[in-house]
Amino acid sequence: MQSLVQSCADQVWPAEVAAVIASRPDAPGLEWAAERGIPTAALFHKEFPSREAFDAALAAEIDRFEPDYVLLAGFMRVLTPGFVNHYAGKLVNIHPSLLPAFPGLHTHAQALATGVRIHGCTIHFVTPVLDHGPIIAQGCVPVLAGDTPEALAQRVLEVEHHAYPAAARWLAERRVSLTADHRVDVQGDPNRLFIWPPASL
């Protein structure tokens, strides 16, 4: 989240961060955002009787700010189909693997267990099928001999901090569109691939 906010300010995107909203009132990003004058809100998911009730309240909170896009960053809850469909074409997530490989949790351990030599992250539109939506961009890192899940996660985080802000800027500049076969096209950036460290692969 911080890399998105900072990139938006530093690179002077044609956009502003409307709000930062968390599912836990103690989320550290809330204080960080508030210190920078960004509106914040928190809805504690354990105070709601069901996922549907929480998602309905979350949607109502988001809609107060009338955003063009909703970007998930560190939001670890599975969203209900009703919520996802409410923001169809506007809801974006980052996942720590090169989808469609390794959906779900523990992606770095999965990558090491299967012996892949390249790992990374995927920025994608969210659909009701978990970790399955149209891919906006991907970031790649090498898997090195002796890697641990923690070491690999840190390397992936570095490429995330480049790929996600770039994808968000494309959205802000209205350069992202979906083709008839539900693939993403980005005007001016046909490759949509980030390699970290540069020239490492």
Kindly label every feature range from the protein language model:
Residues 1, 29-30, 55, 108, ...:
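A general structural signal for well-ordered alpha-helical segments in protein cores
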Residues 1-28, 32:
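N-terminal Rossmann-like dinucleotide-binding module
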Residues 7, 23, 69, 73-187:
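Donor/substrate-binding cores of folate-linked one-carbon enzymes
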Residues 36-37, 87:
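Short, structured coil segments at secondary-structure junctions
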Residues 41-46, 94:
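Short beta->alpha connector loops at strand-helix junctions that form conserved
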Residues 46-59:
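Glycine-rich, highly charged phosphate/nucleotide-binding loops
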Residues 61-67:
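Glycine-rich phosphate-binding loop signature in dinucleotide/nucleotide-binding domains
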Residues 181-201:
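Short, basic/aromatic-enriched C-terminal tail that caps enzymatic domains
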